[in-house]
Regions:
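Bacterial N-terminal signal peptides that target proteins for export
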Residues: 1-8
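Bacterial N-terminal signal peptides
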Residues: 9-18
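Phosphate-group recognition and catalysis centered on beta-loop-alpha active-site segments
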Residues: 23-315
Length: 315
């Protein structure tokens, strides 16, 4: 063996030793790994994006909900998922807007179904959750295509589809090559066929939203039916009594499917508390949810939830 070949072998050996054999995933791959592992810890979902201030990351002002600024803030602070709403404008363009009108979130008025993309592009988004007193920003109404492009490779999207446009939405996701970076969800009752196995829904991460009719539905039975010959990524919980949770946890464990809940407002599990309570005492609210079997939490306070998760993962 020549001196040159010895040096080459030595260099290759050093490179091999320097590279971890099973390096932990990073970026969006790490988020995918966390979501798809039911034992992967808390998944942080930012409701309508990170529109709240995030002072620990230098964001002292609010951003408009469902905006590119709110998405980019989520990426910057390390949120796992941005939840955002999809509707169809008058010309068929899919856009990110929660309400059926533009009144609350922009400086315009009118029904979205009567406005084209050209109309929408003239409007400015109001900061945070909008309203007549909310300041105007330089942010504009975002198309689904723009939202997909801005999030690709950085963060997952949880698309709350507000119109009967599921096929068009999933087709757009597929064209963007983001089937494993997008969550779609739809409501499921006791008579609903397993949604995750249906065409379109079977191409993306899918969460059935369990319908709690009159607050007394057999949610565990609905979840069991939704897992029959299908594999949803999670069951999204409705507003519910705490007494309904243990049976759902048993179903989720039996089928290796996560549970997702909103801690928005007063919280969706009666007696557990909501975001305001959690910001004062995160372990009492978010910690209790997690210990009791709920591991995907949607919040308007993603920075605080991320900080709480970090304390759990230090141990």
């Amino acid at each position: 063996m020549t001196l040159r070949s010895v040096a080459t072998v030595a260099a290759m050996l050093c490179a091999t030793l320097a590279s971890p054999v099973n390096a932990a995933p990073t970026g969006v791959a790490a988020i995918q790994a966390r979501l798809t592992n039911p034992q992967g810890g808390i998944v942080v979902v930012a409701h309508r994006g990170c529109h709240a201030a995030a002072p620990q990351h230098g964001f002292t002002d609010t951003a408009p909900e469902n905006s590119l600024a709110a998405l980019q803030r989520c990426i910057a602070i390390g949120a796992d998922v941005t939840e955002t709403d999809v509707r169809r404008a008058a010309d068929g363009t899919l856009v990110m807007l929660h309400d059926a009108t533009v009144d609350r979130t922009t400086d315009g008025t009118g029904k979205l179904s009567e406005l084209t993309l050209a109309d929408l592009q003239k409007l400015r988004l109001r900061s945070d959750e909008g309203g007549a007193q909310a300041p105007l920003t330089d942010q504009r109404v975002v198309t689904l295509e723009q939202m997909l492009a801005a999030s690709k490779g950085h963060i997952l999207l949880n698309l709350d589809v507000k119109d009967a446009i599921y096929v068009q939405v999933v087709d757009a996701v597929t064209r963007a090559g983001m089937q494993h970076q997008v969550i779609v969800k739809a409501e499921a009752g006791i008579a609903t066929s397993p949604l995750a196995a249906m065409q379109s829904f079977d191409r993306v991460y899918f969460f059935p939203i369990l319908i709690n009719a009159h607050g007394t539905a057999d949610l565990a039975a609905i979840a069991t039916a939704q897992a029959r010959n299908a594999h949803p990524m999670a069951f999204e919980l409705p507003k519910m009594a705490a007494s309904q949770l243990p049976a759902l946890v048993a179903v989720s464990k039996a089928h290796n499917v996560r549970l997702m809940v909103n801690s928005l407002w007063e919280g969706f599990i009666a007696g557990y508390g909501g975001d305001a309570d959690a910001e004062r005492n995160p372990d009492k609210v978010w910690g209790r949810m997690y210990r009791d079997g709920v591991s995907i939490i949607q919040t308007d306070a993603p920075e605080a939830l991320l900080a709480y998760r970090a304390t759990l993962e230090k141990h």
